[in-house]
Amino acid sequence: MSGGAAGPAGPTDAAGEVVGAWLPASLAATGPLSGSGRTLRLLVPGLREAAAGQHVDVRLTADDGYQAVRSYSLSDVRASAGGAGRVPEIELAVERLDDGEVSPYLVDAMEVGDPIEVRGPIGGWFRWPPTRFEPGSAVQAVMPDPLGAAPVDAAPVQLIAGGSGVAPLVSMLRVRGALAEGPEFRLLHSVRDPASRWFADELDGYAAAGVAEVTTFFTRAAPEGGGRASGRLTERELLDAALPAERHPVVYVCGTNGFVARVAEWLVAAGHDPTRVRTERFGGL
């Protein structure tokens, strides 16, 4: 498959933003991720600046004209604005699915210089810094800031990821890490084993530099001396490690359908404001 010609403007996303036209892009660089993952750095002329947490649609076109479209989270948006003669650049993090239609090509076959099409960025809700709505606006009337809470764009940030769901949260950490100062960040990452931990060295670096507190829970195999046996993340463990509800954090949860549903339920039951629990999910339990 290859990238085809740009198509008509797309629909609006869930936040009412225009998704935009299909844009021709090309692979500029790639790198391995733990397990069966790969990062893809794409050059996308004409792309509008992306926010951390957003995603894009990608489209592949076969020689017979058949097209396949999939959505992938952005793991790096820092160069998405382009400017000063630079072409806008984004990074995707893609996990290879054995029965997938698009991911095997992206992970195993796509080479530097190969074309692809991109539409987006998409997502007005799952993004950091979050959009701040002015007092008296229609959105604030429906979803006011919790009593005594800092404005949403100044609130502490809790990131919670299951497996490859860490990708859009890494984009948030990269933006936060580039700031001289900013709100407190914490990341909780539930992952099968150390070998499946995406961006491990970078995340450990953020923890060492004080950018974020990082806690990892291994579900299948834990490292020796880690202090916790392997096993599924429990409600008690999550609530003990996460920022407490009384601090009114903005919480971003990304993972499989089942993981996100469980975590969101635990958070709301513990008193977290539902308007500050923001979720992104993909197939699976």
What are these regions (language model features)?
Residues 1-15:
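Low-complexity, intrinsically disordered tandem-repeat tracts enriched in small/polar residues
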Residues 18-23, 183-285:
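Reductase modules of NAD(P)H-dependent flavoproteins
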